Each structure stands twice: as C-alpha cells, then as structure tokens.
Swiss-Prot record:
Organism: Acinetobacter baumannii (strain ACICU)
Pfam families documented for this protein: TGT
A biological process from GO: queuosine biosynthetic process
Reaction catalysis annotation: 7-aminomethyl-7-carbaguanine + guanosine(34) in tRNA = 7-aminomethyl-7-carbaguanosine(34) in tRNA + guanine
Cofactor details (free text): Binds 1 zinc ion per subunit.
Protein name, per record: Queuine tRNA-ribosyltransferase
Residues the entry annotates as binding Zn(2+): 303, 305, 308, 334
EC number: 2.4.2.29
GO molecular-function terms, A-Z: metal ion binding; tRNA-guanosine(34) queuine transglycosylase activity
Disulfide bond positions: none
Active site: 89, 265
Superkingdom assignment: Bacteria
Length: 377
C-alpha cells in the first residue's frame, strides 16, 4: 500500500491510496457490502455511482457462506465480481454487539452464532486468517469496541486488551501469513483524551499501514464525537491514511474532513433509502410525505445518478406507497451517489483551493451556520 498526501487546506487533506486492486482518491466514502453485496445494488450499479472501494464484513462472511466457499473463488473479489479495492472490518464490532451472547477472554471471544446458535470462537489470529482468505486490500485489526457510556477504568481495560490483540494481529498478518496487503490499527479509549492518546501511542509502537478511529457513532451525543475529532486526527501520523469507522451523516463527514480524516463508511445511505429518506444537495427528502404525490421534479436537480436523470419525485412517492422493491433500489442508487458526489466535491475543492467556500456553500444550502473548527497549529 502507498499513501500520498496531495494537498491540504487547514487540517483537511487531499490524498491518494494505491492498493492491490486499484487507486483510491481521498477523502473517500466506502459503501457497506455486509454479506458481499451492497443492499439493493448490482455490481454494475456500484460502478455507475463511481464508488472506488467497498467494505465487506468479516464476521458475517465467516458465518455465511463460510471460508471454504470464498476460498474456492480465490477470494472475495471474484466471489462478488468486484475488481476494485475492498476493505474488510475484523468482526470485532459485530461480536461485541452481541452482548450477553458472547464471552471475552484474553485468547479471544466465544459467542453463539446469530444464525443457528452454534458456538463460535474468534481471535485476532482467526480474524487475520479470515481476511487473508478474503484477500482484502485493507485488513482491520481485531479489537474490542469500547461501549458508550464507559467509565475511565472500563475504557482503559478495554483499550489495553485491544492493544495486546493488535500486536497479535500484526504478528500473524505479517510474520505468519506473509500477507502483503495493508493492515490498519484501530484507536479506542472511549471519550477520554488521555486514553485515546494511550491507544494511539500503543498502536504507533506496533506500527500499522493506516490508523482508524473506532468507538464513535455508538450512541454518544454529537458534541462528544466532535470533541474527539477536534484533537485526535491531528495527533495521528500525517503520512498515513486516517479512517473514521461507521460515522455517516453528511454533516459529520464534512466536519471530520475539516479535521483531517480521509476515509469513511456507514450503512446510513442504504438504510435510509430503504425507509424513503433521501439525501439531496439542500438536505433531506422524506419521500413518503404526501406533498410529493404530484411533484414532477427530480429527486435532486443537482444529481447525475440514474434515479435523478430518469424519475420524478411523484414516481418515487408512488413506489414507496405501493411498497415496491424498486423504491429501495432507486433510493439506494441515489443516496450512494450523493455520498460519492459529496466526497468528490471535497476532493475537487481541495484540488482547487476552494475548500472553505465548499464548506460555506454546503451549510448555506441547509440554512445553517458553519460550525467552528480547530485551526492548524
């Protein structure tokens, strides 16, 4: 993996990632393909919205269809017919979302499969082996996602376990498996700045190809999230990619880019599309509202996606009211293209030296003031 920083405005960065299966321009949004598919999308649809990289889920693919099936296809790329880069999460977040269904020990985590109730064991080494079979361009370490809320003691105990697991991930990935694909560390520590520092410094000692911010978008108030983003990205290595995991409101992505983050993923655009909530240049359209019944305009006149070029809001309203599958498909195409256009717009603005104007326009269209942002030291 190679990362180049091509430009900067304040703390916002313009970069380029070169991976085994292609080049990724940053800032970038990665559509989530949990089970080896982005819900409601054909592979050619994902190409059409100009996604550069997608995310796969180690936990779910390990349980179903299982490694043997994917191994027979030579990896996840051929299995799902996607020839561009793939990032896979380690399965840690999903395991720790199981609550009482899992038991954490130093060796790893034992849990009951949500599919059939069978007992499953997942460890740092097993996670690395799964992602090696998947042949992910970017592999994420296996860690414990610190819950919210957590006391200082709980968050510290959790991050220290994650650091021990991080070292095991690095050893197995590089030394045992000889995997040449990128391995990213994940910074934990809850909402505590001293613990975030401890986690980051521990990961830097081990050494990774990129660094992710974990443990956000887990129920904390937005003010808490912004507080972490105010100080943490700027402490992360300036020559490595920075990835904010699972944070996905458009405003949150813009604010994170302003603070120096490069990579994003979230289920929000696909999940919201299935509920008739569509992101547009001026904010949000809730298409089930009766005011759209006779609306002859496109969903977003500024959008170049298949949905906006071909269909009216009235038609989308009709599909939603009828419960037609096509409503979710067209909405997903639009929402994911919106997210690609958002990050494209930020990349162009960073290239052209107009990033501040981009941010001002983004908020002005929503009738909002530009929030304060730390200036570069």
């Amino acid at each position: 993996m190679k990362f180049e920083k091509l430009g900067q405005s304040g703390r916002a960065r313009r970069g380029r990632l070169t991976l085994e299966h292609g080049v990724v321009e940053t800032p970038v949004f990665m559509p989530v393909g949990t089970y080896g598919t982005v819900k409601g999308m054909l592979p050619r649809d994902i190409e059409d919205i100009q996604a550069q990289i997608i995310l796969g889920n180690t936990f779910h693919l390990y349980l179903r269809p299982g490694l043997e099936v994917i191994k027979q296809h030579g990896g996840l790329h051929d299995f799902i017919k996607w020839n561009k880069p793939i990032l896979t999460d380690s399965g840690g977040f999903q395991v720790f979302s199981l609550g009482a269904m899992r038991k954490i020990k130093e060796e790893g985590v034992t849990f009951r499969s949500p599919i059939d109730g069978s007992k499953v064991f997942l460890s740092p080494e097993i996670s690395m082996e799964i992602q090696h079979v998947l042949n992910s361009d970017i592999v994420m370490i296996f860690d414990e996602c610190t819950p919210y809320p957590a006391t200082h003691e709980e968050a510290q105990k959790s991050l220290q376990l994650s650091l021990r697991w991080a070292k095991r991930c690095k050893t197995h990935h590089h030394d045992e498996l000889k995997n040449k694909n990128a391995l990213f560390g994940i910074i934990q520590g809850g909402m505590y700045e001293d613990l975030r520092d401890e986690s980051l410094n521990g990961l830097l000692e081990i050494g990774f190809d990129g660094y992710a911010i974990g443990g956000l978008s887990v129920g904390e108030p937005k003010e808490e999230m912004i507080k972490v983003l105010d100080y943490l990205p700027n402490k992360m290595p300036h020559d490595k990619p920075r990835y904010l995991m699972g944070v996905g409101k458009p405003e949150d992505i813009v604010e994170a880019v302003r603070r120096g983050v490069d990579m994003f993923d979230c289920v929000m655009p696909t999940r919201n599309a299935r509920n008739g909530h569509y992101f547009v240049t001026d904010g949000l359209v809730r298409i089930r509202n009766s005011k759209y019944r006779h609306d002859q305009g496109p969903l977003d006149p500024h959008c170049d996606c298949y949905t906006c070029k071909n269909f009216t809001r009235a038609y989308l309203f009709h599909l939603e009211k009828c419960g037609e599958m096509l409503a979710s498909m067209l909405g997903t195409i639009h929402n994911l293209r919106y997210y690609q256009r958002l990050t494209e717009g930020m990349r162009d603005a960073l290239d052209n030296g107009t990033f501040d104007e981009f941010v001002q326009d983004f908020y002005a269209r929503r009738g909002l003031e530009v929030p304060p942002c730390p200036v570069d030291e």
